[in-house]
């Protein structure tokens, strides 16, 4: 029996241990390298010290390094919050830099315009026949010889005098109109000069003047600029708020969409970028390399082509001549600006420098090699073409030159690049367009279609004097059109937003998620409280902990403590740096569009930090890098591979369980707090003074009442049990007998009758022939078996303990003897140490006495010597006096 008991006990212990070990619990890890896509506002940084740079962006310190991480991530230039924010922000910059501020429909009245000018520019009827038109008619009927291409360079004389072949005067019309000014009862005549494209005139009128009006008078959302602002390219970069990061696809084959980019780097800011606003071309971009590459939309034929910077492609624009701008007061507070012309100026124009033909040929060769392209492989069948029609910003190349909006007719340039001098494209052009030149005519407009939103703005006339701007052409905005199987058109596009998809399309914004859950076999143990680690941390930078993003979960978990401290310190450091530059940027208090955006960025950073800390605190995991819990694992089928799986991969698998795990952790923490509260209430019994508290006496009264009620109830239960026991013996109380009840007296043989009346109640239990009822006997049997079982357990345990004690007795005796010998050795050594210590004390005292006496004797001798020397010195005058006296005597 003893051996069997031991075996059962061992088996029970093994089963308990295996059961505890097999149960896995949720463990919270803080500081893991994982992230998810985010859409929070970014803030900008720039080195520009102009008005815009100080009011819109934070100062840029240029210290933004990148860190390579061994992960695979998806990138999309068109479905990208970074590019969308850039497009929206540059539009806001465009609006605030050239700011329309007065909502009105200006000058929607009939004007009297110069009829000769309206006829000349084709506003009223058919233009008068000219030599140019005659030549056009002849050209359409008779073949002409090939036209020699006209190419100009920087040293060409026509550039200096603005007299290159084909350039004409600006198409402008002088008009007069009467309008009520400040005095409503009096009208005043005004003179105004308009671009011909901004006017609509009555056709075939026989009057001396043409009746014209603005062609946008029926547009209700027209705004006039309240002041002339300077617009120029501005370089800036985007930065992520603290707690967020920017991933970049560093693959040279990236073409705007990559579901599995394996070369990923992480940084806190993007590269520098330019504020570009133009159609057809991108200017001064930062993505130009010594190669041509194409970003292609994943679901359409929209492309943005980065040109090879080796060919040094440039565009230089000029607006010659002088203008005089005068204000026209419409009413109080509303002023419209007119531009009377002193002398008819030459029209604006742009010329293109660099090896354009080689660059376009390389674009065609790159297009043929692109995996999305399915057209002809013959580059001579791929043509660079202009759009068919639409807004002026589409049909013309639209750009901004020092705050002025240029619309350039690009037929000459396309004919020159494609070397077109015959064919359908050549014959479809009018005579003026049939030229092959590396420069194009342009015109300036005041009424502009907005490029980001539907609407129109009215801006001030151009500045006086010459306007010149130089730009580097870095990209083409185009759509790839397959005409048929043998021909492909690269059609220039007016999608200004594509420029920023090229600049920032290889970035994506992610939110660092340092909190993760994973199952472990360790259960939370109760502690008195969380203790902070107060050791200093060498801050490696906020993004340093992401270096382990490609490592296995086990390797990353080993460094969680340092990573989490680096993460927290990095977030705080980022916030401090952001706060410092905001303090230096005093103009931020003006809260411009981007100023408010920068302020919102700091608020976002603080919210994220507080959110993470509050979440950890709600789970009881504050200030812990690895926090074990009492929550069982919710899904047994998901088990992490600690050696071959990264934290990012594990997070993707268990993302759907996050809500349930979070709720379970909060419930477990609430229950633990309740248990802690109940346990703390028991601590009040430790202090004897709390026993005499008034609130305690009220509880004592309650306890007393409950005890009295319990005693009364117990007495009632005992009485009922006794009555039932008597009934089981065959007796019933007299007061409860029914009327027809006749008490039966049992006949007892061989015994005397009872002599006392009081013995009648006990006579039923004294007969020799009486026995217990079978229920009572069964209960006694169970009690006897239970007593035997307990006796056997007691004896077995006692024997087992005795055997173990007998087994351990020699070991204990040997241990006792060893301890005794060790005690003797220690006692002897302590005695030696005490004797040596006393000897050292006596030696030190003797040495100190000797030193003291020696120093005292030396001091006395020195003092006597000094005294004698002093007295001798003091006696010198006396000796001299005595000598003199003796001499005189």
UniProtKB/Swiss-Prot annotation:
Which sequence ranges are marked TM in the entry?
Answer: 705-725
Annotated spans, Disordered: 120-145
Coiled-coil intervals: 648-675
Task: Report residue spans for region: V4.
Answer: 408-442
Q: Where is this region: V3?
A: 317-349
| Region (Fusion peptide), start-end ranges | 536-556
The sequence motif named YXXV motif is recorded at 731-734
One Gene Ontology cellular component: host cell endosome membrane
Q: Which domain of life is it from?
A: Viruses
Q: Biased-composition ranges for Low complexity?
A: 126-145
A biological process from GO: virion attachment to host cell
Report the residue ranges where the short sequence motif Di-leucine internalization motif is annotated in this entry.
888-889
- Region annotation Immunosuppression: residue ranges? 599-615
Query: Which keywords describe this protein according to UniProt?
Result: Apoptosis, Cleavage on pair of basic residues, Coiled coil, Disulfide bond, Fusion of virus membrane with host membrane, Glycoprotein, Host cell membrane, Host endosome, Host membrane, Host-virus interaction, Lipoprotein, Membrane, Palmitate, Signal, Transmembrane, Transmembrane helix, Viral attachment to host cell, Viral envelope protein, Viral penetration into host cytoplasm, Virion, Virus entry into host cell
Q: Which residues lie on this side of the membrane: Extracellular?
A: 23-704
Task: Write out the ranges of the annotated region (V5).
Answer: 485-492
Signal peptide limits:
1-22
Q: Tell me what PTMs the record reports for this protein.
A: Specific enzymatic cleavages in vivo yield mature proteins. Envelope glycoproteins are synthesized as an inactive precursor that is heavily N-glycosylated and processed likely by host cell furin in the Golgi to yield the mature SU and TM proteins. The cleavage site between SU and TM requires the minimal sequence [KR]-X-[KR]-R. Palmitoylation of the transmembrane protein and of Env polyprotein (prior to its proteolytic cleavage) is essential for their association with host cell membrane lipid rafts. Palmitoylation is therefore required for envelope trafficking to classical lipid rafts, but not for viral replication.
The molecular function GO annotations come to:
structural molecule activity
| Annotated region described as V2, given as residue ranges | 175-217
InterPro entries named among the record's database cross-references: Gp120_core_sf (IPR036377), GP41-like (IPR000328), HIV1_Gp120 (IPR000777)
Residues on Cytoplasmic side: 726-889
The answer to whether keyword Zinc applies is no
Q: What does this protein do?
A: The surface protein gp120 (SU) attaches the virus to the host lymphoid cell by binding to the primary receptor CD4. This interaction induces a structural rearrangement creating a high affinity binding site for a chemokine coreceptor like CCR5. This peculiar 2 stage receptor-interaction strategy allows gp120 to maintain the highly conserved coreceptor-binding site in a cryptic conformation, protected from neutralizing antibodies. These changes are transmitted to the transmembrane protein gp41 and are thought to activate its fusogenic potential by unmasking its fusion peptide. Surface protein gp120 (SU) may target the virus to gut-associated lymphoid tissue (GALT) by binding host ITGA4/ITGB7 (alpha-4/beta-7 integrins), a complex that mediates T-cell migration to the GALT. Interaction between gp120 and ITGA4/ITGB7 would allow the virus to enter GALT early in the infection, infecting and killing most of GALT's resting CD4+ T-cells. This T-cell depletion is believed to be the major insult to the host immune system leading to AIDS.
Q: What is known of its domains?
A: Some of the most genetically diverse regions of the viral genome are present in Env. They are called variable regions 1 through 5 (V1 through V5). The 17 amino acids long immunosuppressive region is present in many retroviral envelope proteins. Synthetic peptides derived from this relatively conserved sequence inhibit immune function in vitro and in vivo.
- The molecule here is called Envelope glycoprotein gp160
Quick one: which gene encodes this?
env
């Amino acid at each position: 029996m003893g051996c069997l008991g031991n075996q059962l006990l061992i088996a029970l212990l093994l089963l308990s241990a295996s059961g505890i070990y097999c149960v896995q619990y949720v463990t919270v890890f803080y500081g893991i390298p994982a992230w998810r896509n985010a859409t929070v506002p970014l803030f900008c940084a720039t080195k520009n010290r102009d008005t815009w740079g100080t009011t819109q962006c934070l100062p840029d310190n240029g210290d933004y390094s990148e860190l390579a991480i061994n992960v695979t991530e998806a990138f999309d230039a068109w479905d990208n919050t970074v590019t969308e924010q850039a497009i929206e922000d540059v539009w806001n910059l465009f609006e605030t830099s050239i700011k329309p501020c007065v909502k009105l429909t200006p000058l929607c009245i009939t004007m009297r315009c110069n009829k000769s000018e309206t006829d000349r520019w084709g506003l009223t009827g058919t233009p008068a026949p000219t030599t140019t038109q005659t030549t056009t008619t002849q050209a359409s009927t008779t073949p002409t010889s090939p036209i020699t291409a006209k190419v100009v360079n920087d040293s060409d004389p026509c550039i200096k005098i603005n007299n290159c072949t084909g350039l004409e005067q600006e198409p402008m019309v002088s008009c007069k109109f009467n309008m009520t000014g400040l005095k409503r009862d009096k009208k005043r005549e005004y003179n105004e000069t308009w671009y011909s494209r901004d006017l609509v005139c009555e056709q075939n009128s026989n009057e001396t003047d043409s009746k014209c009006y603005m062609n946008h008078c029926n547009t209700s959302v027209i705004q006039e600029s309240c002041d002339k602002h300077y617009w120029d390219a501005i370089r800036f970069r985007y930065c992520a708020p603290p707690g967020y990061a920017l991933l970049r696809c560093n693959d040279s084959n990236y073409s705007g969409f990559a579901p599995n980019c394996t070369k990923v780097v992480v940084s806190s800011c993007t590269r520098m970028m330019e504020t570009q606003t133009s159609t057809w071309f991108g200017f001064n971009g930062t993505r130009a390399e010594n190669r041509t590459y194409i970003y292609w939309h994943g679901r359409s034929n929209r492309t943005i082509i980065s040109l090879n910077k080796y060919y040094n492609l440039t565009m230089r624009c000029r607006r010659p001549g002088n203008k005089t701008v005068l204000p026209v007061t419409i009413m109080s507070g509303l002023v419209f600006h007119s531009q009377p012309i002193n002398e008819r100026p030459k029209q604006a124009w742009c010329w293109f420098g660099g090896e354009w033909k080689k660059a376009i040929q390389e674009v065609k060769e790159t297009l043929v090699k692109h995996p999305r392209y399915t057209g002809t492989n013959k580059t001579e069948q791929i043509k660079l073409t202009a759009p068919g029609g639409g807004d002026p910003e589409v049909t013309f190349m639209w750009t901004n030159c020092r705050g002025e909006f240029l619309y350039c007719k690009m037929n000459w340039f396309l004919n020159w690049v494609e070397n077109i001098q015959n064919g359908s494209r050549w014959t479809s052009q009018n005579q003026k367009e049939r030229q092959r030149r590396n420069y194009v005519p342009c015109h300036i407009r005041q009424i502009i279609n907005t490029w980001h939103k539907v609407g129109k703005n009215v801006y001030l006339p151009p500045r006086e004097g010459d306007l010149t701007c130089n730009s580097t052409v870095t990209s083409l905005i185009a759509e790839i059109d397959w005409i048929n199987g043998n021909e492909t058109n690269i059609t220039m596009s007016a999608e200004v937003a594509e420029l920023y998809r090229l600049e920032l399309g290889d970035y994506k914004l992610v939110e660092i998620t340092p909190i993760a859950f994973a199952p472990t076999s360790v259960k939370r143990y109760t502690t008195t409280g969380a203790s902070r680690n107060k050791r200093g941390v060498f801050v490696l930078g906020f993004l340093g902990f992401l270096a382990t993003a490609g490592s296995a979960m086990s390797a990353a978990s080993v460094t969680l403590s340092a990573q989490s401290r680096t993460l927290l310190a990095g977030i705080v450091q980022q916030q401090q740096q952001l706060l410092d530059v905001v303090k230096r940027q005093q103009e931020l208090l003006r809260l411009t569009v981007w100023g408010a955006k920068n302020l919102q960025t700091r608020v976002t950073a603080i919210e994220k930090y507080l959110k993470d800390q509050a979440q950890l605190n709600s789970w009881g995991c504050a200030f812990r890098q690895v926090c074990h819990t009492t929550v069982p694992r919710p899904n047994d089928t998901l088990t992490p591979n600690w050696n071959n799986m990264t934290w990012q991969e594990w997070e993707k698998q268990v993302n759907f369980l996050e809500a349930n795990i979070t709720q379970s952790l909060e419930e477990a923490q609430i229950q633990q707090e309740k248990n802690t509260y109940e346990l703390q209430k028991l601590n009040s019994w430790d202090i004897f003074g709390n026993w005499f508290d008034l609130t305690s006496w009220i509880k004592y009264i309650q306890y007393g009442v409950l005890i009295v009620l319990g005693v009364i109830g117990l007495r009632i239960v005992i009485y009922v049990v006794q009555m039932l026991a008597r009934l089981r013996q065959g007796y019933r109380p007299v007061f409860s007998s029914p009327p027809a009840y006749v008490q039966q007296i049992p006949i007892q043989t061989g015994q005397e009758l009872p002599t006392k009346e009081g013995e009648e109640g006990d006579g039923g239990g004294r007969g020799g022939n009486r026995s217990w009822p079978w229920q009572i006997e069964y209960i006694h049997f169970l009690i006897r078996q239970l007593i035997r079982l307990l006796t056997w357990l007691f004896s077995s345990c006692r024997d087992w303990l005795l055997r173990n004690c007998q087994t351990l007795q020699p070991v204990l005796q040997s241990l006792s003897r060893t301890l005794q010998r060790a005690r003797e050795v220690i006692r002897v050594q302590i005695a030696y140490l005490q004797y040596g210590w006393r000897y050292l004390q006596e030696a030190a005292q003797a040495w100190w006495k000797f030193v003291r006496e020696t120093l005292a004797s030396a001091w006395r001798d020195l003092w006597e010597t000094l005294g004698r020397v002093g007295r001798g010195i003091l006696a010198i005058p006396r000796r001299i006096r005595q000598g003199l006296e003796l001499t005189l005597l």
